[in-house]
């Protein structure tokens, strides 16, 4: 059962961030520029996935709660092999009949940790969010057919480092599918569990997609958003595991009869 907590909070003012180089300090605007139903709220939620596992989901518009979850994700990433340090990312948009469309919800996933950040309900950006999205070395963001997502994020004042981003649809194909544009559900059903073939049918695309601006988000949309980010993360992890395993097998096969290679 989810428990929501919310309170009204005023927008934060612009502030100067110091620069140790002695140059003029940058003016940083922490206010979220996207119009919407502003509400400071947090909904923690356990979301069931296949094999009776649970996702630990935090849906929030509160910058401190978002920062806490981002720090937890960074800690998880720090304990991983560098090859597998990735963050699953997905974006939901404002209504297409009210242009210009912008990002309304940003979802991030690392293992079972999921952040569903409700941008249009927020008044202030989390301090950890932009540094996370612009990280240059430590991890890679993984999305699915995400060119549009990146554009909507940029319109909303956020940008993912283009040098640390992978579009999974351009890196993998579902065997025997044959279609040029394959879906996330098809990827997830092939790589994770067959039940994900129906994952996009859990909500009414016409009616429920108009509710992303409602604060707080209803639980069914939180679950939908969390699973999108999770299957993106999990599918890419399996792809990377297979690619790494095949690469190591090729190397091992080339040295199969070499006792010095195996250390005996």
Which residue ranges define each predicted feature?
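Conserved DEDDh/DEDDy metal-dependent 3′-5′ exonuclease domain
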Residues: 58-70, 84-87, 93-238
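N-terminal accessory regions of nucleic-acid-interacting proteins
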Residues: 1-85, 122, 168, 237, ...
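Generic macromolecular interface patches on structured domains
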Residues: 198, 242-245
């Amino acid at each position: 059962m989810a428990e929501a907590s919310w309170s009204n909070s005023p927008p934060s003012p612009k502030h100067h961030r110091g620069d140790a180089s002695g140059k003029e300090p940058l003016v940083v605007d922490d206010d979220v520029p996207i119009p919407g139903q502003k509400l400071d709220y947090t909904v923690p939620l356990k979301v069931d996935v296949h094999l009776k596992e649970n996702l630990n989901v935090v849906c929030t518009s509160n910058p401190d709660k978002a920062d806490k979850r981002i720090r937890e994700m960074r800690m998880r990433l720090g304990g991983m092999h560098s090859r597998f340090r990735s963050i699953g990312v997905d974006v939901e948009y404002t209504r297409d009949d009210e242009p210009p469309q912008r990002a309304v919800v940003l979802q991030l996933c690392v293992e079972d940790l999921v952040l569903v950040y409700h941008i249009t309900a927020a008044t202030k950006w989390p301090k950890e969010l932009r540094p996370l999205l612009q990280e240059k070395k430590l991890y890679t963001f993984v999305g699915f057919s995400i060119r549009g997502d990146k554009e909507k994020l940029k319109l909303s004042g956020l940008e993912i480092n283009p040098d640390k981003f992978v579009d999974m649809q351009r890196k993998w194909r579902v065997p025997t599918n044959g279609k040029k544009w394959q879906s996330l559900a098809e990827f997830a059903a092939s790589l994770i569990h067959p039940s994900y073939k129906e994952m996009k049918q859990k909500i009414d695309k016409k009616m429920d997609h108009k509710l992303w601006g409602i604060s707080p988000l209803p639980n069914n949309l939180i679950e939908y958003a969390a699973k999108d980010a999770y299957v993106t993360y999990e599918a890419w992890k399996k792809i990377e595991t297979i690619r790494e395993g095949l690469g190591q097998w090729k190397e091992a096969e080339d040295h199969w009869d070499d006792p010095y290679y195996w250390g005996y």
